[in-house]
Design a protein with these regions (language model features):
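Membrane-anchoring alpha-helices and their flanking helix-loop junctions
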Residues: 1-93, 105-174
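Catalytic beta-strand/loop module used to bind and position nucleotide/cofactor moieties
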Residues: 96
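Histidine-centered phosphotransfer motif of kinases
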Residues: 99-105
Length: 174
């Protein structure tokens, strides 16, 4: 992260993260969709695929927003965006009670939606690259969080899935 952002007020930090997310998850897929190939035939199936794609984009954006809002609400008073990738607190509420990585899951959903909408190989390739990066980063972050939070994070690892929510195990209360 840039040094100038180290002590930025959190509202300004949220705005900068939002602008970055729009660039990464809207502008980049659009530009990739313009690479090579002719326009595909139009018709009811295409319209349905685009509609489903746009719904997937909206769902992913909503999940990302919910995750960001959970961080905003959980941040201690006086907290400012700093250069660490992970905050100084363990967040277990909001979407983080269902998935350890709701931001990545939301981002992947946005890219999946654009891939369905644009139906271009370059956008599908972008989705694959994003998913591979998210998987690698999530494993790296888990090691850092285990070091930082110890047993609390180990419990969280056992209770909450990495990506998608799962049903409770039989005989256990949630």
């Amino acid at each position: 992260m840039l040094r100038c952002m180290k002590r930025m007020p959190r509202t300004a930090g949220v705005l900068i993260w939002t602008l970055g997310a729009v660039a990464m998850h809207a502008v980049v897929p659009f530009e990739l969709s313009r690479l090579g190939g002719r326009a595909r035939p139009q018709g009811p199936a295409t319209s349905a695929a685009r509609g489903a794609g746009l719904l997937t984009v909206a769902a992913g954006a909503a999940l990302m927003t919910w995750a960001l809002a959970a961080h905003y609400q959980a941040a201690p008073r006086g907290w400012a965006l700093d250069s660490r990738l992970t905050p100084g607190y363990l967040l277990r509420r909001g979407p983080y009670r269902l998935s350890r990585n709701p931001m990545y899951a939301g981002e992947a959903a946005v890219w999946l939606g654009w891939a369905r909408c644009y139906r271009r190989p370059a956008v599908w390739a972008g989705l694959a690259i994003q998913c591979a990066a998210f998987a690698a980063i999530a494993r790296w972050e888990e090691q850092r969080l285990l070091t930082r939070f110890g047993g609390d994070y180990q419990d969280y690892l056992q209770q909450v899935p990495r990506w998608a929510p799962r049903s409770p195990k039989r005989g256990t209360a949630r």
